[in-house]
Amino acid sequence: MDLNLDAPHSMGTTIIGVTYNGGVVLGADSRTSTGMYVANRASDKITQLTDNVYVCRSGSAADSQVVSDYVRYFLHQHTIQHGQPATVKVSANLIRMLAYNNKNMLQTGLIVGGWDKYEGGKIYGIPLGGTVVEQPFAIGGSGSSYLYGFFDQAWKDNMTKEEAEQLVVKAVSLAIARDGASGGVVRTVIINSEGVTRNFYPGDKLQLWHEELEPQNSLLDILNAAGPEPMAM
């Protein structure tokens, strides 16, 4: 199989944003690929825009990075001019405007999440084309196709912070198990009135699904775990 190392860097990706009763939780995997080649196993796909607003990035790594950089700059100017941080809604609509005005060139889907004193915790999904949709939860990236049914069953309104983060970590680990373009570690960002908390979940601490093997220390351990019991002589 030939690898095209000149292919654009793509975050095949699973990104998630969830509201809870005091704020929002954002989550993402960490795999960045170039065609079939894994270019980065531990990339950070949750990018800070302001002190209280973050964005989850999927699609073309270059496109999503440049959009985030422009938005961060404009929001900084907004804060200087108005003397207060931009709201989550303002941040999301600025991304929507950039995505819509450049929709023929950009290949990126984004989830904006944050907390502000006017509306509390908010999640906005901004898919390809520049639509902006406020949602109680949003999922995106190639791994999202495996999660719609899961969220239909597992989502509930007015969750606690702990319940929301557990849901996000479980969902991303499920997508990693099923989606070849998602992988690596799970990162979460919790945003509420008290500030921002970042958490990191390494791959060997994630929940295993169905036929996945428990981690083994050696080839002998793997063979012993997979093989039948030896017959008595």
Swiss-Prot record:
Highest classification ranks of the organism: Eukaryota, Viridiplantae, Streptophyta, Embryophyta, Tracheophyta
Top enzyme category: hydrolase
Residues at the catalytic site: 13
Subcellular location: Cytoplasm; Nucleus
Record has Isomerase as a keyword: no
PANTHER family: ATP-DEPENDENT PROTEASE SUBUNIT HSLV (PTHR32194:SF0), METALLOPROTEASE TLDD (PTHR32194)
Keyword check for Hydrolase: yes
Database matches in Pfam families: Proteasome
Gene Ontology MF terms in the entry: threonine-type endopeptidase activity
Name of encoding gene: PBA1
Name the UniProt record assigns to this protein: Proteasome subunit beta type-6
UniProt organism field: Arabidopsis thaliana (Mouse-ear cress)
Quaternary organization: Component of the 20S core complex of the 26S proteasome. The 26S proteasome is composed of a core protease (CP), known as the 20S proteasome, capped at one or both ends by the 19S regulatory particle (RP/PA700). The 20S proteasome core is composed of 28 subunits that are arranged in four stacked rings, resulting in a barrel-shaped structure. The two end rings are each formed by seven alpha subunits, and the two central rings are each formed by seven beta subunits. The catalytic chamber with the active sites is on the inside of the barrel.
Family affiliation: Belongs to the peptidase T1B family.
